[in-house]
From Swiss-Prot:
Belongs to the acyl carrier protein (ACP) family. It comes from the Bacteria. Residues 2-25 form the Carrier domain. InterPro entries: PP-bd_ACP (IPR009081). The gene is acpP. Transmembrane segments: none annotated. This is Acyl carrier protein. It comes from Alcaligenes faecalis. Pathway: Lipid metabolism; fatty acid biosynthesis. The keyword Cytoplasm applies. It is found in: Cytoplasm. The keyword Lipid biosynthesis applies.
């Protein structure tokens, strides 16, 4: 079972990835 911290970090990483993709596009 993932801890809340791990889940938050995963979500943040995904959001940053999307932001980077949009900036580079």
């Amino acid at each position: 079972m993932e801890s809340i911290e791990q889940r938050v970090k995963k979500i943040v990483a995904e959001q940053l990835g999307v932001a980077e993709a949009e900036i580079k596009a």
